[in-house]
């Protein structure tokens, strides 16, 4: 089964054929580290971590690069407001980023390059563009000359005339054409700066990714990915810079994830309806957040609401409960071989369907449907009077494998004695208040965690199942 990827560049699904057999070069645009990330910022790391995991599962050696923009207008503004220097703020939020995405199940990239650690290669990249006539200096700034690059607009599928009509030259900019964009910005008084052939300054945003992608992955990469909002102008400008310099295709497959809406309204800082990851993971299990994000195809928008999150949690718990029941039943199973082949054959069908979903542009929504199918099928098997260790182990292994591909964990942390006692007390209060629905819910939840309650004349006793 071959993998097909929807390529933003061609607007169609294409068979994935990497440049080098069994090797994948992948670049994902990382954050500007001036604040905590919100859930919209967190979608690309989760989506493309899952893509990476699946490629690795299929046997590819994935070289995965994701950068940090650690010098930028937003960072300088934050530094001025807080009375701190730019490196201090950047270091703080790089650490916060790692804490957040690690909690969400994302592996570290092969390399996490920072702009400030690669200034020499960025300056050299700009210098080469100037020498080739694709860039020009203007009073200490350096701009890319878009009219010199014939393919400008090919990623966003917009004619250059239309793009130019919507562009403008801002006050203080010294460029020749409204579509030209900054490669190097002359330092203003009091700003952090680096020495360059054009004077003191710092790089523009777009050049950073082109330079670092080239350094760590070469002139041509297999997959370049990021949020939908980056397609234009960021990724369009990356293509222009890189292909103008090398004369080679910059990236062969372009992948972009969709937006996140909050209660059916587009999430934005201007509307004040954004949710920070480090806040939401205090309220909800980070694994649930990831499962929720993957329950929708990565190119589609996601509507984020507490109601939908709770509904997703119910589904996730059903799978985890089936897994827990399988593990619990393993001890009492035998080497029974009757009917083994039938159940194992069904498991193979689920595995095939899961891979077919992932091969179809990494359709995690359909892949998760197969997780539900495995769990439901397992529950049916557990109704058998006699169960086989071989079949039980096959179910357990399959669930663990599929969850791992999606960056999810199945094991539940064992409840502490005091946590159990607190839940029992909450159940007692519910019964006193004749809230029998809550009482039953607590009992059932504890049962799912292998905690058995026994109501006696002396009170409620419990034991681990």
From Swiss-Prot:
GO terms for molecular function: ATP binding; cysteine-tRNA ligase activity; zinc ion binding. The keyword Phosphoprotein applies. ATP binds at residue 269. The keyword Repressor does not apply. A motif ('KMSKS' region) lies at residues 266-270. Zn(2+) binds at residues 29, 209, 234, 238. Binds 1 zinc ion per subunit. GO terms for cellular component: cytosol. CDD domains: CysRS_core (cd00672). It catalyses: tRNA(Cys) + L-cysteine + ATP = L-cysteinyl-tRNA(Cys) + AMP + diphosphate. InterPro entries: Cys-tRNA-ligase (IPR015803), Cys-tRNA-synt_Ia_DALR (IPR015273), Cys-tRNA/MSH_ligase (IPR024909), Rossmann-like_a/b/a_fold (IPR014729), tRNA-synt_1_cat_dom (IPR032678), tRNAsynth_Ia_anticodon-bd (IPR009080). Monomer. This is Cysteine--tRNA ligase. It comes from Bacillus thuringiensis (strain Al Hakam). The gene is cysS.
